[in-house]
Every structure is written in C-alpha cells, then in structure tokens.
C-alpha cells in the first residue's frame, strides 16, 4: 500500500474520531483517541486495523460500536471509496499490553505500572531497563521517570532501599511497553 494513501486514510480516521465519545457501564462519556492504524493488503482485500483507546481504557462493546460507526462512515464517504476501491475488512481494537506506547495520553494512564523501556542514552548506546513508571513530564523537554529499584522479598528488619530513579527524555525512547504484573 502506498504511504500517501495510508496517510489520507489515517487523517480521515483522525478527523472522524476527533469528536467521538463512548460510554462506560455507568453511562459516563469518554473521548476516543486514535493510537495507531495499520493497513495491510493482499490480492483480494485491504485490512484496516484501527487501534483506539480512551483515557480510562476501552471495552469490547466500545470497539464494536466504533467498528460499526467507522464502517458506515467509510461506506458513505466517496473519498474513502476512491482510496479503498475493493473490498476491505475493518478491525477495531484496543492497543493491548504488547503494543509499545506511542502517545502522551497512553503514558498518563499507565503511571504506577511496571514498564520496559528501550532508549538511546547520551553516549548513543541502546539500553533496556525495567522499572515502575512514576511520573510524566510534559513541560520543557518531555520525559518519563522510572523507579528501577530491584523489587526484593522483604526480610525481617531489612532496611528498605531508597528509590533509584531514571529520567528518560521522550526523544531518546525507542520503545516503551507496559509489563503484566501477577
């Protein structure tokens, strides 16, 4: 698929979702944001994968609602019909835990969680660290701070270790993935 076509589809979806909201089980409205879009083609069909979220998470029911809405809008849009002249399959889902974080909004909702971050340090070395994500700085040079203190089983009378904090500018982050805790 051509990059310019993907960009047009992505821009159209961004505009479509810009004012969208979904409801949680309590009836509260949440603004939807587009995390990523992937378009794959084979000989007979285009597959459009839309990864959407809200600041409080997105449910399967929300994804079904979005899928129906986006599909109806794609079918009704002459612009999209020109970009998708053949059959397409639309898949709407949450980004899931295995996908890297790509937006500040995703970072905000994951404060307090364990993360694995791959970044390029000031010396140009690629490093990967695990730690608890404790803060997000959005002013000046945007960055995240992790507590990389090793979690050890507490021994009686053991003195707790002081936090070992690492701050990483967004410009150095190559990949940040939330880790599953058991």
UniProtKB/Swiss-Prot annotation:
Pfam family of the protein (one): RimP_N
InterPro entries assigned: Ribosome_maturation_RimP, RimP_C, RimP_N, RimP_N_sf
SUPFAM superfamilies (alphabetical): YhbC-like, N-terminal domain
Keyword terms: Cytoplasm, Ribosome biogenesis
Similarity annotation: Belongs to the RimP family.
Entry keyword annotation includes tRNA-binding: no
Superkingdom per UniProt: Bacteria
GO BP, sorted A to Z: ribosomal small subunit assembly; translation
Source organism (scientific name): Chloroherpeton thalassium (strain ATCC 35110 / GB-78)
Compartments, as annotated in UniProt: Cytoplasm
UniProt key word Cytoplasm: yes
GO cellular component: cytosol
Transmembrane segments: none
Name used for this protein in its record: Ribosome maturation factor RimP
Function: Required for maturation of 30S ribosomal subunits.
